[in-house]
Amino acid sequence: MRAEYKNMKSSVQKVNLVADMIRGKGVDVARSQLLFLKKALAKPLSKVLMSSVANAQNNFGVDPDNLYVKEVFVGKGMSLKRFAARARGRSASIRKHYSNVSILLGVLDGSKG
């Protein structure tokens, strides 16, 4: 019960700020937090979360009410190298960072909640 988003246009540190908010929470709580969060990364992470819920529902037949966010992996993706003009005919390199995100869901037991 996993979904991935490869090469999200943001750095790992920025994605981790949002990912820390949903780790270990129920799917409905995590989705509502992402829905009302005023960060640009909340929308793509919400889509990945709902994709993993759909994978759990369609592939494993699990009830979405019994799911929680077990793990959120945020890793370094590709980085584009660009160059900007500087004074005296020089140039400076600019790196545009990307991230890979993977959300793993677990099934709630009676003891967990």
Swiss-Prot record:
This is Large ribosomal subunit protein uL22. Part of the 50S ribosomal subunit. NCBIfam families: rplV_bact. PROSITE patterns: RIBOSOMAL_L22. Coiled coil: none annotated. GO terms for cellular component: cytosolic large ribosomal subunit. It comes from Neorickettsia sennetsu (strain ATCC VR-367 / Miyayama). GO terms for molecular function: rRNA binding; structural constituent of ribosome.
